[in-house]
């Protein structure tokens, strides 16, 4: 349904289509959360929210998270489903080629980033600015609706190999990369209700 509505959005953009897609996605996430509760009934969640932080489904939030495993996004969605707007996060452009998943990311307004190597940027410095412009446009598109934008400060999932290669000063974390967060704050700073 999300993809079909997304195609109609190409012909005639509509806030109603966006809202319907969000509702469909939230229904799917509700089923996912129910499945998690069934498969892991003894799971104990320890999630803390800053005192006085008033989260709501109509808010605009920027969320940061360490990226320990592929489960991180599932946990963020589980936590946020009834507390915050749909959680979106920066994704790799290459995911657009995964049938259904990549297209759903695009339709739902997930900011998609192309990754360029240092060698590619050195050869063509414009690539760096082109990607920043795409990220800026993606962030600005979020402003037409309530949103939660998740930023993994480490930029990639933790692994012992990456940790050793980076010589991270942190025991269980990679070195943070502030670029994505700085970009989002720069674009959204006056529009977010909480970080």
Feature-to-residue mapping (PLM):
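Soluble catalytic domains of membrane acyltransferases
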Residues: 39-195
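Membrane-anchoring hydrophobic helices of lipid-metabolizing enzymes
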Residues: 1-61, 75
């Amino acid at each position: 349904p999300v993809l079909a509505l997304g195609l109609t959005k190409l012909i005639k953009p509509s806030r109603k289509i966006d809202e319907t897609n969000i509702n469909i996605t939230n229904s799917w996430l509700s089923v996912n959360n129910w499945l998690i509760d069934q498969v892991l009934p003894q799971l104990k969640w320890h999630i803390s929210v800053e005192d006085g932080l008033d989260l709501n489904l109509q808010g605009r939030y920027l969320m940061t998270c360490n990226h320990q495993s592929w489960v991180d996004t599932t946990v963020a969605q589980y936590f946020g489903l009834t507390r915050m707007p749909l959680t979106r996060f920066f994704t790799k452009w290459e995911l657009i080629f995964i049938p259904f998943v990549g297209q759903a990311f695009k339709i739902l307004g997930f900011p998609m980033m192309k990754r360029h190597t240092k060698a590619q940027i050195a050869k063509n410095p414009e690539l760096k600015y082109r990607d920043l412009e795409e990220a800026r446009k993606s962030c600005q598109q979020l402003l037409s609706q309530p949103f939660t934008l998740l930023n993994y400060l480490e930029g990639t999932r933790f692994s012992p190999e990456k940790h050793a290669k980076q010589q991270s000063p942190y025991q269980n974390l990679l070195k943070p990369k502030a670029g994505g967060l700085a970009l989002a704050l720069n674009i959204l700073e006056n529009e977010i209700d909480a970080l």
